[in-house]
Amino acid sequence: MDTEALKKSLLKKFQEVTADRLQKIQLGVLDLEKETADQAAEDVARELHTMKGEARMLGLAAIGQLAHAAEDVLRAEREGKTATEVATDVLLRACDVLSDLNEDLSGANTGNPASEEMVRMLAEVSGQTPPAIAGARPVAPPPAPPPAPVAAPVVTPAAVAAPPAPVQAPVAPPPTQAPVAEPGAHAAAAAPHPAAAHGRDEEAPSAAKSAVADRSIRVNVEVLDALGLLAGDLLVESARGRLRSSETEALFERFSRLGDRFLRLAEEIDISNEVREQLDRVESDLHMLRDDAFRFVRRNDDGINTLHGNLAKMADHVAEARLVPLSTVFDAFPRAVREMSRTQGKEVDLVIENADIGVDRSMLGDVRDALVHLLRNSVDHGVESPDTRQQLGKPLNGRIRIRVRVDGDMLHIEVEDDGRGIDPERLRQAAISKRLINAVQAAALSEREAIELIFRPGFSTRDQVSELSGRGVGMDVVKRKVETLGGSVGVSSRIGRGSTITLRLPQSLALMKVLLVRLGDDVYGMPAADVEAVMRVKPDDRLEIFGTLAVRHRGKPTALVALGPLLGLNGGNRFDKPPAVVVRHGEDHAALVVDGFVDEREVAVKPCGGEFLKAAPFIAGTAALEDGRIAVLLHVPDIMAEVRRMARPVTQAPAAKRLRVLLVDDSPIARATEGALVKALGHSVEEAQDGEEAYVKVQNNTYDLILTDVQMPKLDGFSLARRLKSTPAVARIPVIILSSLASPEDKRRGLDAGADAYLVKGELGVEVLAQAIDRLT
């Protein structure tokens, strides 16, 4: 990733996280005067410390300094050196200043008068001397100490927005001490809601529902389908109009040049004055005609461009209207899983994440059917019985997790269980017994290829038909449904730990961003989400591994395949034509050689039916282009399966040392920053938000290295290191502590706890991290 782009991304993420963090801090500060003060102080201290570390990591010195000063006030309050009421007031005001700095990061490095004054105020309250901020403006000390502040409550926007703590009865403020708004406070935020002011709180929900109902109508899905197709066709037609407009302009240019040539020729020949005068009038008319023509073309261009833009917006709105939240079908799953597990004498918990993400409504039925089958498989085949789980040391209740995320135009739905996993050897034997493959073929299968046997029609490892599954409708049906929608299915599993099935689907069937390439005179498209890079294959980058052609891509050998012959096309591309598209599917990559690139654009997709897919397995659909041609859209998963079959030796080439690293930090900013460094070294990263979660992950997975922060909820980094080193099964995994705590005492505590290395976050870089990792692994 580009360094500047990464920094912008991290700063944006910092702003989002810090806004939520400040809300938590303010709620915690308000609890300092309550019975839960000890827990509140601990929570506030952790949030302030994490914010300070994140800010310093991103070079936001003013925010880091202000958070540090706030920590001092909190510590003084806990030690009884500062009155709780005074500490509460000043910490809330500090939150306001931090919020202002966070909204506009331009002053978050060197600070501004408000932040500098706030640091001094915090230092006075805590009895500390504030250190200077690097790059800050020197400020003269005040000539005399300020007068004691008037004890008046301070109302801030965040405080107004925060949910009130429960009370026994409403308490009115004293009439002589009206709340005073800070200069930066928004009056609208402080104003009471009209309904609440008149005692009509209960009427608000019904009024809101009525307002929503007034803005909503039911639309038949067939109407939306027709609108989607029409919008796509109109978009293509408007693009053709733009093309014709460009061609018209080029035609007028040719006409203008021809007129100029004619007039120059007339000037060179000897003609009478009368003819000369007529030619002059013709010249004048030609210039007027040319000017009128160009004005017409420009007006036409403007109109067509406006039309095209509006049609593009309309197509986007239609595509958005087709999206419905997955919760529409997910809401029925908890009860379904409960009933399935009861029939099996099992207890299974279902966890669903991000069910509010939308999917094309025409896909809902197929998505529901596929997921129901996956849930049935997880309950029946995956999760063990309570007795077996108890013997294995697992929780008696099994767990199935449905996780949804969006990656570009594609939707990823993962169904994960913590059951017995999939045994590749058992699948090989089942395939042999069912005569799907012979023993030689089974032995040649890699572990992943053996697991993918579950997608063979009629394949099952069950000898008996159960009430729940095993009735001849298998994973091949799931795969076929998903691929008919232009998607793909992936599976990963670890014996004894569970399995994960991932459905990868287009979020919308109306429009898709594709990369268009040329093979001969024809145009083909690949989903942009499947394209990792485009490149020109240099002779020096080509290599041969075990008789298979490959190319170096990002330092690793990648199968090099001519796309034309793979699709069964005669002639066309050869390896002396350098353009190539690097596509990916799961962990597989391939460089597909083409004849040329066209461009990347959004197209209206017309999917092919299942019968067509059987006859042409590499084809996912078609799209009309503005020049009248039809682009054939390729199904990358099928192509990658064929490439894997053709280029199997490439996957057997010796790979560079690649570690599986567990990164433990409660700060998402720190995880993103440190994770980028680890990935830059070529290693894979998994994350945990605290020591407790990390220890569970280590028990259930295999890692080559653990990087951990120190100050975290539930289980801190020192305690995590001690627990890991006292557990024989994982004691040999190297542990590196990454912390903003830089004192010799902190480093000694980390190493005494069992850490193999202690690195300070402020000094962290690729070289420092690489040296530590190389030394320990």
UniProtKB/Swiss-Prot annotation:
Pfam families xref list: CheW, HATPase_c, Hpt, Response_reg
Origin species: Myxococcus xanthus
Residue(s) carrying 4-aspartylphosphate: D709
Main EC class the enzyme belongs to: transferase
Catalytic activity: ATP + protein L-histidine = ADP + protein N-phospho-L-histidine
InterPro entries found in the cross-reference section: Bact_Chemotaxis_CheA, CheW-like_dom_sf, CheW-lke_dom, CheY-like_superfamily, HATPase_C_sf, His_kinase_dom, HPT_dom_sf, Sig_transdc_His_kin-like_C
Gene: frzE
EC id: 2.7.13.3
Modified residues (Phosphohistidine): H49
Name recorded for this polypeptide: Gliding motility regulatory protein
Family annotation (CDD domains): CheA_reg (cd00731), HATPase_CheA-like (cd16916), HPT (cd00088)
